[in-house]
Amino acid sequence: MFKRLRRLRSSENLRAMVRETRLNINDFIAPLFVIESDSGIKNEISSMPGVYQMSIEPLLKECEELVGLGIKAVLLFGIPKHKDATGSHALNKDHIVAKATREIKKRFKDLIVIADLCFCEYTDHGHCGILENASVSNDKTLKILNLQGLILAESGVDILAPSNMMDGNVLSLRKALDKAGYFHTPIMSYSTKFASSYYGPFRDVANSPPSFGDRKSYQMDYANQKEALLESLEDEKQGADILMVKPALAYLDIVKEIRDHTLLPLALYNVSGEYAMLKLAQKHNLINYESVLLETMTCFKRAGADMIISYHAKEVANLLQRN
C-alpha cells in the first residue's frame, strides 16, 4: 500500500485549501530612496527598472500609491547633496530622511516608517562609518550611529534598522534610545548581513560604492553558516526586536537556521541584484515573470521569513489584489 499524495492536488481550489504557505500584503516592506533636492526629482535607475531616486514630493506620491495597495511599511534610504569623511549630513536634524519622515507622518500617520541606519550613503568614501588607518573604527562609529538614531527617532521614525554590521551596535543603540526616552522605538537589526556581490545595483541607486577596498572586514563571509546564526543570536541578546537576513535568494538555508533558533520576528531582504536578475529575465521573455515572482516570494516565507523587504513589493501587492 502506498499513499496517494496526488489526491490533494487534483484541482486549484483543493490545492489552495491545503496550501501551507500563503502570501499576504502585510508581509511586505517597500524600500524607497529619497534624494535631497529643491525640485521634484524622480530618477529611474537603469540597473533597477521601476526603482527611483525621489525627492520628497514624488516620494509622498509613491507612499500614497503604496498605502492604496495595502502596503503598511516603507524602508527609507537617504541620498544627500553633501558627503564628507564622517557622514556629517546624517547628524543634522534636518537631514533628508528626517525631513522625509516628518512629511510622510503628516500625510500618512499609520504608514510604518523604517529608517536604514548607516553611513555609507553619507560618507565620501562609501564605507559604513569613521575611517581610522584605512579601516572602519568600530567603537567610534557606534557613537555617531547612536546620534543618527536619536535624530531619526525624534523625527518620528517608527523602527530603526542599523545595517552597518558594527559589533555591539544593537546594545549601544538600545541604551542610547532608552536613555533619551525612546523606550518604545523598536530595532530591526540587519543581524546577518553578508558581504555579497548581489548588492551591485543598490550602489547605483544609493550612490554609495566604496571608494577603495570592500566591506568584507565588517560584513559577513557568505561561506559561513555557524557565524551567520551567531550574529543573529548575539543581536537578539543585545535587544534587537526584529532580526534580518540579507541577501535572500541564495541564503534560504540561513533563514531556516535562524528561524529554528529564535522566536523573534525575522525579516528577509530581497536585494537589488536579485531584483535586477528577474527584471532582466522579464525583459527578454525568458520566464513567466509573474509566476516566478510569486513563487520566489512564497519560498521566502516558506523558509521562515515573517516579513519581506523587496523592490517587488508594489508589483506583488497588485498581483495579490488581482488574485
Curated annotation (Swiss-Prot):
Binding-site residues, 5-aminolevulinate 2: S272, Y311
Role played: Catalyzes an early step in the biosynthesis of tetrapyrroles. Binds two molecules of 5-aminolevulinate per subunit, each at a distinct site, and catalyzes their condensation to form porphobilinogen.
Protein family according to the UniProt entry: Belongs to the ALAD family.
Entry binding sites for Zn(2+): C118, C120, C128
Entry annotated with the keyword Magnesium: yes
Binding partners and assembly: Homooctamer.
Catalytic activity of the protein: 2 5-aminolevulinate = porphobilinogen + 2 H2O + H(+)
Catalytic-site annotation from UniProt: K193 (schiff-base intermediate with substrate), K246 (schiff-base intermediate with substrate)
GO molecular function (one): zinc ion binding
Binding site for Mg(2+): E231
PROSITE patterns per UniProt: D_ALA_DEHYDRATASE
Cofactor list: Zn(2+)
Protein name, per record: Delta-aminolevulinic acid dehydratase
Pathway: Porphyrin-containing compound metabolism; protoporphyrin-IX biosynthesis; coproporphyrinogen-III from 5-aminolevulinate: step 1/4
GO annotation, cellular component aspect: cytosol
Gene field: hemB
SMART domains the UniProt entry points to: ALAD
Residues that hold 5-aminolevulinate 1 according to the record: R203, R215
Cofactor remark: Binds 1 zinc ion per monomer.
Classification via Pfam families: ALAD
Gene source species: Helicobacter pylori (strain J99 / ATCC 700824)
Biological classification of the source: Bacteria, Pseudomonadati, Campylobacterota, Epsilonproteobacteria, Campylobacterales
UniProt EC number: 4.2.1.24
PANTHER family in the cross-refs: DELTA-AMINOLEVULINIC ACID DEHYDRATASE
Residues that span the membrane, as ranges: none
